[in-house]
Amino acid sequence: MIRASIRARHLAFASTLALGALSAPVAAQDVAEANDDAEGVAAEDAGGIVVTARRREENLLDVPIAVTAYGAEALEESGSLDITDIGDTTPNVTIENSRATNSTLSAFIRGVGQQDPVGGFEAGVGIYLDDVYLNRPQAAVLDIYDVERIEVLRGPQGTLYGRNTIGGAIKYVTRRLPDEFEAKVRATYGTYDQAEAVVSLAVPLGDMFKFGASGARLSRGGFGDNLNLGIENYNKDVWAGRASIEFETPDDRLLVRISGDYTHDKSNPRNGHRLIPGALSGAPVLDNVFDTRAGLTVPAQDIKAYGLMMNIAAELSDNFTLRSISAWREDKSYVPIDFDALPTVDVDVPGIYFNDQTSQELQLLYSSDRLNGLVGFYYLEANALTQFDVILATTGPLIGVPLGANFGQFTSGDVNTETWSAFGDFTFDFTDWLSVSAGIRYTKDNRRSEILKANRLGLPSPEFGGAGVNLGAPITDFTGEASFEKWTPRVSVSLKPTEDLLVYASYSQGFKGGGFDPRGSANITPNTDGVAGPPSYAEIYDFFLFEPETVDSYEVGIKGSLFDRAFTYALTGFYADYTNVQIPGSVGVDANGDGIFEGFAGVTTNAGKARFKGVEAELFARVARDFAGPGSQITLAGTAGYIDAEYREYIAIIGGVETNLAPFRGVQNTPKFTASATLGADLPVGPGDLSANVTLSHRSRTQHFEIANPYLDQPAYQLLDAGVTYRWADDRFSLGVYGKNLTNERYITSGYPFIATNATTGVPVLANGTPVPSLGREGALTAFYGNPRQVFVSGTVKF
C-alpha cells in the first residue's frame, strides 16, 4: 500500500505546480491511497481528478475553464503557510498581503484585482470559503490548516459566481470529516522563532452524525524591528479554530454540514520601510528593509474574524439535487497605519474596519446522460464601515495650527450592500466528443453610502479613544443610493476527441459593482453646472459615484495527457476587453490652491477602456519511474504565464481639459511574465516514503500602481523554495524540512507613494534631487517586502 500510494501523493504535489490537478488526483487522492497495487493507483491517476469550478463535481478534463487546484498534501509538501503562497506557481496570478497588514488580502488574476481594502470598493477576484463568498478582503489571508484543496479559477466567472469575479475566483475548501475517529497533531518550528501547532479531532457520533474541530496557534518573531517603539516588525501572533458537525443519512441522499470558524490576529502593526530620507527631519534610510521607525500606536492593533455556515445537499431523485448554502460572517480590524514610518506625526492613520454579511444561496442541480447543469438564486446583505484619521501634525503650522494641536482629518464611510441574483448554466453533450455549455446570470445590486469627512484638532478622534474635535463644518456629509443591474452570460464549446484530450472555446462576461468613494472630499468637487458657490448635491453625487466595471472575455484552451499520463499539459489563450475600468486613487488635497496639502481624499474614476490578452501553460512530466523500487519516480513540472495588459483609454481632467493618459499609465500588480519550474522525486526509504521537491519561480517587473514609480516598482526577481517530507507507518507519522526564499531575495510587494508627480506623465517632481511630498512634509514613500528566507521543520502524528 505504501509503495503504491507514493506515486499518487507526489502526482498530487506535481499538479499543484503544473496543471492544477490535471496530472494527479486531488479530490480523489485519498481513494488512490487506499489501493494496494500500483495498477490501481495508475487507474485512479488517469480519471479521478475532480474540481467544482462549475459548482458541480466534474473531472478537470471536462471543464472548459482555466483552473489550477492545490490538494492538501501538495500544500504540505511545498511548505505552504497561507493562501498567498500559491501565487508563485499559478500563472498570471498575484496574491499578497495588502500593505500594512498580516491578514488583509490583495489578489490579482490576469490583471484584475483590488489594491485598496477600503469598504465601498469591490474586489475583482472573488474569495470563497466553502462556497461562501467573502465580501471584504479583511481577514481573507487564510492560513493553511484543515484544508482539502484550493482552486484558482482564472478569467471572468460572472455567470456561476456573480459580481466581483471579473478577474477570477479563489476557492478555499475545508476538509470533510472522516467516517472513523481521527486525531492529528502538527507542530512546526523554524527561523525567526516560528512556532506553530495545529490539533485536529474528528469523532463519529453514531451512524449519521460526526463532529470535528481544529485549533491552530501560529506565531513567528519579526523579520525586523520597530527601532522607535522597541517591538518586532513583521511578526505573527494568531489563534484560530474551526468546528463542524455533519449529519448524513445512510443512503447518502441527505447531507447537512454546519461549521464555524474563528481567527484572532494579535500581531504587531506591520510598518513599512522608507525609501527616501525624511524631508523635514532628515531621518536616514535604514539598512534593514524590515526595520522601521514608525511611531503610531493608536488604536492597538487587533483583528478578529468569525462566521457560521450551513451547507445542505439533498438528493431529490436520480436526476435532481437541491443544495443550500447559508452563511453569516463578521470581522473587526483595528489598525494603526503610519504612512511616513517615522516617529514624527506626519501622515499617521489610525483606522478601523467593521464588516458583516449574511448570505443565502439555493441551487437545483440536474444530471442525466446528456444534459447536466443547475439553476440557482443568491442573496447577500452586507455592511462595511471604514473609519480613519489622517493626522497631519507637521502640516498644521503651515496653516496656522500649532504642531502639538495634532491637526488632521477624520473620515467615516458606511456602505450597505444588498444584492440578489438568479442564474443557470447547462451543458449538453451532442455526442461523446461534442458538448455545448450555456449560462446566464441576472444581478441586481443596491448600494447605500454615508460619508462624513471633517477637519479636526486634537487627534486621534474619539472613535479611536482620543479627544479630536471638529474644526469648522464637515467637509463632506453625504448620503447616496444607487442601483445597478447586469446580465452576465457564458457560452462554451468543447471538443473531446479522446478521453485524454479537451479542446474548448468560450465567451463570458463579468462585472465589478459600482458605488461611491467612501473617502470622498466634497470640497474638491468639480463645478459642472456653471453655478458659483459650494457644489450642489447633484455635483457631489456624480463626483463620488463610480459605475460598474464590465468585461467581455474570450478564451481558447487545450488540456490533455500522453503516454499513460506520464506527460500532461494545459494551454490557454485569452483576450479581454474592459470598459468603465474603476481606478481608485488616494491623493493629497490642496483645496484653496495655496500649495499646501492640508487634507486627504479618495478619488475613484471610471477611466475608460483596457485590453488584456495573454497565454498560459501548465506542464507535467514523469521523467523516471520505478527506478529505485516500486513507486519511485522523478517528475518535472512547469508553469508559464504571459499577459499584455494595457489601458486603451484613461480619461482625466488636466487643467480643465479631458486628457487621455493611457500612454502614461500601466496596469498594477500585473507582471508581464510569470513562470515556475519544480523538480520532484519520490523514493521508498526504509519503512516509509521520502518526497522531495525544489521550485524556482520568476516574476518580471511589477508596477504597483497605475502611475509608474521608479522608487517603488519591483524589478524582475526569482524565488527558490524546497521541501523534503518523510512518511511512515501508513502515513501515521510524517516529518518534513522546508525552505522558502532560500536565496533571501529582497522584493517589494506594495507601498505608499505620497509624492508629487507630473499630472500627465506621472514622473516624480523633484527638489534638489529628492521627491516632493504630496501629503505631509516628510515625504511618505514607504515599501513593504515579501518574506525573507525561512527554514522550518514540521512533524505530524495521526492517532
Give the role of each language-model region.
Residues 178-180, 188, 200-297, 331-345, ...:
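Periplasmic-side early beta-strands and strand-to-turn transitions of outer-membrane beta-barrels
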Residues 1-78, 83-90, 202, 256, ...:
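N-terminal Sec signal peptide and the immediately downstream disordered periplasmic leader
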Residues 311-315, 321-337, 496, 502-508, ...:
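Membrane-embedded beta-barrel scaffold of Gram-negative outer-membrane proteins
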Residues 44-180, 556:
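Acidic, small-polar-rich N-terminal luminal/periplasmic segments of exported/outer-membrane proteins
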Residues 697-705, 726-799:
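C-terminal beta-signal and adjacent terminal beta-strands/loops
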Residues 122-124, 136, 145-154, 159-227, ...:
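Outer-membrane beta-barrel translocator/receptor signature
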Residues 372, 432, 436, 566-578, ...:
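Gram-negative outer-membrane beta-barrel transporters
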Residues 118-121, 177-182, 205-209, 250-253, ...:
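Short loop/turn motifs that connect adjacent beta-strands in outer-membrane beta-barrel proteins
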